[in-house]
């Protein structure tokens, strides 16, 4: 029972870390990275498709992404989708290849993205703490129902707190790395 609660808490906290990683990856830095375009949807074959399903996105150099459409007829739609996205990117097309240069970040945009990253990290911490709260409530219920002793509850609560501290430290480390990346000129 206690192990099930701890395992569930660890799994849910791990999912919060994974979500944090995805959210931080979508925040643009000065460097080109294919995940920047993950949010771009392209009108293709009668529906909105994610860009990575209709084209191959690769890094050409440190500041340029190269996009090759799987279907050459989609090149114009891909270019338009990137232009109309709220990413502030300006693609240029050369036949079936689309190049997306990454504009240099101004000090103001760097600080804005750092604030955004901080908010994402704080949301992840809140999610981890909510998991801890749920796990502690489950332990209290087991104690109340006399399924475990108070000593076992206290021991398990300490282990869950250590788990929470470990995941919060991971979140802080991920944020610090992203912040360093954003503030590097």
Curated annotation (Swiss-Prot):
One of its GO terms (molecular function) is ribosomal large subunit binding. It is found in: Cytoplasm. InterPro entries: Ribosome_recyc_fac, Ribosome_recyc_fac_dom, RRF_sf. One of its GO terms (cellular component) is cytosol. Keywords: Cytoplasm, Protein biosynthesis. GO terms for biological process: cytoplasmic translational termination. Its main location: cytoplasm. Pfam families: RRF. Belongs to the RRF family. PANTHER family: MITOCHONDRIAL RIBOSOME RECYCLING FACTOR PSEUDO 1, RIBOSOME RECYCLING FACTOR. Responsible for the release of ribosomes from messenger RNA at the termination of protein biosynthesis. May increase the efficiency of translation by recycling ribosomes from one round of translation to another. This is Ribosome-recycling factor. It comes from Pseudomonas putida (strain W619).
């Amino acid at each position: 029972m206690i192990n099930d609660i701890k395992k569930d808490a660890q799994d849910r906290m791990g999912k919060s870390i994974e979500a944090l990683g995805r959210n931080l990856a979508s925040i643009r830095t000065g460097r080109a990275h294919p995940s920047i375009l993950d949010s771009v949807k392209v009108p293709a074959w009668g529906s909105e498709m994610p860009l990575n399903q209709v084209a191959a996105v690769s890094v050409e150099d440190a500041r340029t992404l190269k996009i090759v459409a799987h279907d050459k007829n989609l090149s114009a739609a891909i270019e338009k989708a990137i232009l109309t996205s709220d990413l502030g990117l300006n693609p240029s097309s050369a036949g079936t290849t689309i190049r997306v240069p990454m504009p240099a970040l101004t000090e103001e945009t760097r600080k804005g993205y750092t604030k955004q990253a901080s908010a994402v990290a704080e949301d992840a911490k809140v999610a981890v703490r909510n998991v801890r709260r749920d796990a502690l409530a489950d332990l209290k219920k087991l104690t109340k129902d006399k399924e475990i002793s108070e000593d076992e509850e206290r021991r398990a609560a300490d282990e869950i707190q250590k788990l929470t501290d470990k995941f919060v430290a991971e979140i802080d480390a991920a944020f610090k790395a992203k912040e360093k990346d954003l503030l590097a000129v």
